């Protein structure tokens, strides 16, 4: 004879713990989600980082390629002895001579101040540009390469000139860097030019004659 408890189970059915888990129509239609592949975590930590590194390298290569149009070299004819001697007459004559700029730039490289000449040349090229779209792009590159405090080739400019450039960069023009170019020109004239005239480089040219060609690497 069943006990009262067993009789109650017969009437009400099995307890919840005894019932098999019910399955919804959604559960029966969809297969169980696969277990997480341990390789997924490895891809997130390794492959994605490698992909980001590739993107950074591609961005850097693109930026460097954009900087190539900036004037970085000049090829010039062999200077005559008279031309070499004229460089000592004034800094203007040196800077107006392609061969003079080439030799002077090589000298600045030995003093780790070549960026001054590069900046001056870039400003000269900018002033000769008439296309506004090209002016905007070149002005941005000049700023990033020679004016920004984050650049390894930053030139020495006072705060007044820097503030003026920052304002002009809102609407760049071919003359955005005129004040800065003059300041760097004056710096090279007063600081580097006297040392250049007394350097072995210039003295050798005075004695050498016209046999050696002058070009910038």
Curated annotation (Swiss-Prot):
Chief localisation class: membrane
List locations, semicolon-separated: Membrane
Keywords per UniProt? Autophagy, Lipoprotein, Membrane, Palmitate, Phosphoprotein, Signal transduction inhibitor
Q: Is Transport a UniProt keyword of this protein?
A: no
Q: Which PROSITE patterns does this one have?
A: RGS
Gene Ontology MF annotations: GTPase activity
Entry membrane topology: Lipid-anchor
Xref: InterPro entries: RGS, RGS_sf, RGS_subdom1/3, RGS_subdomain_2
Is Lipoprotein set as a keyword in this record? yes
How this protein is processed and modified after translation, per its record? Answer: Fatty acylated. Heavily palmitoylated in the cysteine string motif. Phosphorylated, mainly on serine residues.
According to the UniProt record, where is the region Disordered?
A: 1-29
- Describe, as the record does, how this protein assembles with itself and its partners: Interacts with GIPC PDZ domain. Interacts with GNAO1.
This molecule's function is given as: Inhibits signal transduction by increasing the GTPase activity of G protein alpha subunits thereby driving them into their inactive GDP-bound form. Binds to G-alpha subfamily 1 members, with the order G(i)a3 > G(i)a1 > G(o)a >> G(z)a/G(i)a2. Activity on G(z)-alpha is inhibited by phosphorylation and palmitoylation of the G-protein.
Question: Know the name of this protein?
Answer: Regulator of G-protein signaling 19
Organism source for this protein? Homo sapiens
């Amino acid at each position: 004879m069943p006990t009262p408890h067993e009789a109650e189970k017969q009437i009400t059915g099995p307890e919840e713990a005894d019932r098999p888990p019910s399955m919804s129509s959604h559960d029966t239609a969809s297969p169980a989600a696969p277990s997480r592949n341990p390789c997924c975590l490895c891809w997130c930590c390794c492959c994605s980082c490698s992909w980001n590194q590739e993107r950074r390298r591609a961005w850097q290569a693109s930026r460097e390629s954009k900087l190539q149009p900036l004037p970085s070299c000049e090829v010039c004819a062999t200077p005559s002895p008279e031309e070499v001697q004229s460089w000592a007459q004034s800094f203007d004559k040196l800077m107006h001579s392609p061969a003079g700029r080439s030799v002077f730039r090589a000298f600045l490289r030995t003093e780790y101040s070549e960026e001054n000449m590069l900046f001056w040349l870039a400003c000269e090229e900018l002033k000769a540009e008439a296309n506004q779209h090209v002016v905007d792009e070149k002005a941005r590159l000049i700023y990033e390469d020679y004016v920004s405090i984050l650049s390894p080739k930053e030139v020495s400019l006072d705060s007044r000139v820097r503030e003026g450039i920052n304002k002009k960069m809102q609407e760049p023009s071919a003359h955005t860097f005129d004040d800065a170019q003059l300041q760097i020109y004056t710096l090279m004239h007063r600081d580097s030019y006297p040392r250049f005239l007394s350097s072995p480089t210039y003295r050798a040219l005075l004695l050498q004659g016209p046999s050696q060609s002058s070009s910038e690497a």
